[in-house]
Swiss-Prot record:
It holds the Pfam family SAICAR_synt. The gene is purC. Signal peptide: none annotated. Its EC number is 6.3.2.6. It catalyses: 5-amino-1-(5-phospho-D-ribosyl)imidazole-4-carboxylate + L-aspartate + ATP = (2S)-2-[5-amino-1-(5-phospho-beta-D-ribosyl)imidazole-4-carboxamido]succinate + ADP + phosphate + 2 H(+). This is Phosphoribosylaminoimidazole-succinocarboxamide synthase. The lineage of its organism: Bacteria, Bacillati, Bacillota, Bacilli, Lactobacillales. NCBIfam families: purC. Pathway: Purine metabolism; IMP biosynthesis via de novo pathway; 5-amino-1-(5-phospho-D-ribosyl)imidazole-4-carboxamide from 5-amino-1-(5-phospho-D-ribosyl)imidazole-4-carboxylate: step 1/2. It comes from the Bacteria. CDD domains: SAICAR_synt_PurC. It comes from Streptococcus agalactiae serotype V (strain ATCC BAA-611 / 2603 V/R). Belongs to the SAICAR synthetase family. One of its GO terms (biological process) is 'de novo' IMP biosynthetic process.
């Protein structure tokens, strides 16, 4: 059925379209943290996230990365290929920060010699636990070959993103990706890429991402607007 709400999330709602293989994603003016324990409505945030993610996914598509992104259709809406989401958050860390620093008792800001890829099991009831390859296989999420693909593709995407952000004076600290199976059973990049799911620091170490909200550092939309303007100029 066309225009039927098929999923509602913390930051996005997803609707069906007249094409069974295409969905309409609507970005919300909502910021959350602690797995949704803290929520706040922030006017304009949805449009900024949508525009930033659209720009990034357009560049990834042009660079040969296969993604779910089709086109932006309004300031806070885009069309995407329908996928079966793999219940994994794939996190890549270039620099120590956030939960990584807390977990291992290391200071933020240490550049990792080799970027680290981590898996988190997407399960709200379990608070998205950190898991390893063996857990992924035990849970039947993906197989060895698919695990290797997820890691390799994430590292490839990281190299592209690091270069693009460096060109606009931003350091890509870490980020979270989600992947899904398309109608042909191929794994493709899904979800979004915005300051909601990555850490960006400027040359002075200022946070240009959702940590502004998490740590009460100022106006989230002001920071996101700066990131958007930098990406438009890229």
């Amino acid at each position: 059925m066309t225009n039927q709400l098929i999923y509602t999330g913390k930051a996005k709602d997803i609707y069906s379209t007249k094409d069974e293989n295409v969905i309409r994603t609507v970005y919300k003016d909502q910021a959350t943290m602690l797995n949704g324990a803290r929520k706040e409505t922030i006017d304009g945030k949805g449009a900024l996230n949508n525009q930033i993610s659209s720009l990034i996914f357009e560049k990834l598509n042009m660079a040969g990365v296969v993604t779910h992104y089709i086109e932006q259709i309004s300031k806070n809406e885009q069309l995407n290929k329908k996928v079966d989401i793999i219940p994994l958050e794939v996190v890549l860390r270039n620099v120590t920060a956030g939960s990584f620093s807390k977990r291992f008792g290391v200071e933020e800001g240490h550049v990792l010699e080799t970027p680290i890829v981590e898996f988190y099991y997407k399960n709200d009831n379990l608070n998205d636990p950190f898991i390893n390859d063996e857990h992924v296989k035990f849970l039947g999420i993906v197989n060895d070959e698919e695990i290797a693909y997820l890691k390799g593709e994430t590292r490839h995407i990281n190299e592209l993103l690091k270069d693009w952000f460096a060109q606009i004076g931003l350091n890509l600290i870490d980020f979270k990706l989600e992947f899904g199976f398309d109608k042909d059973g191929k794994i493709i990049l899904a979800d979004e890429f915005s300051p909601d799911n990555c850490r960006l620091w400027d040359a002075d170490g200022n946070h240009m991402d959702k940590d502004v909200f998490r740590r009460d550092l100022g106006s989230l939309t002001d920071v996101y607007q700066v990131v958007l303007e930098k990406l438009i100029a890229l």
